[in-house]
Amino acid sequence: GCADEPLESLSGKTPLQAANIPAMDEIAATGHVGKANHVPAHLPAGSDVANMSLLGYDPNEFFSGRAPLEAAAQGIQLGPYDWAIRCNLVTIQDQIMDDFTANHISTEEATELLQFANSRISDSRLEFIPGVSYRNLLVYRGSESDQPFTMETRHTAPHDLTDKSVSNDYPRGPGSDLLVDLMNQSVEW
């Protein structure tokens, strides 16, 4: 971070302590310190919720998960009945989450795997969308009469399962059967 560690070459000071930073010194001397909470208590504490709030969007009204924000950042158009779902590539050994980043898979390799997965899906409403490295999306193109997911559809973030069994932490709630089926199929592909 900005403060870094004390260095012998700087007489035991951190780079920040040794730097000539009059503007920052002025702010520190005359500024005020406060705090703000940008994450409502009932929403997951994460940068997606906090950034939405910092940008002026009430997460109570607009937050529907990280994936729609990532889809928008990629220029993916979502209709009123479409769902963007985060699709992380992971490494599981003997039902234990070995690595939630798929060993830091390259974007190129992840794209190749997702293209293969798309070729195996017979449901035209589903499409895997490559992102960066292990962080990807699944887009479900729904309709007014076809909405399997709701805000009650839940999952456990892969990073929360590191070195733990994944056998009891599948998606749950409306539409989870579709997601679990895709997860199980992906093991066979």
Residue spans of the language-model regions?
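Active-site nucleophile/metal-coordination loop of metallo-enzymes that catalyze phosphate/sulfate
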Residues: A3-S119
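Structured catalytic/translocation cores of nucleotide/phosphate-coupled proteins
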Residues: G1, E5-P6, D25, A157, ...
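A contiguous, mid-domain pocket- or channel-lining segment that forms the substrate-recognition surface
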Residues: R66-S186
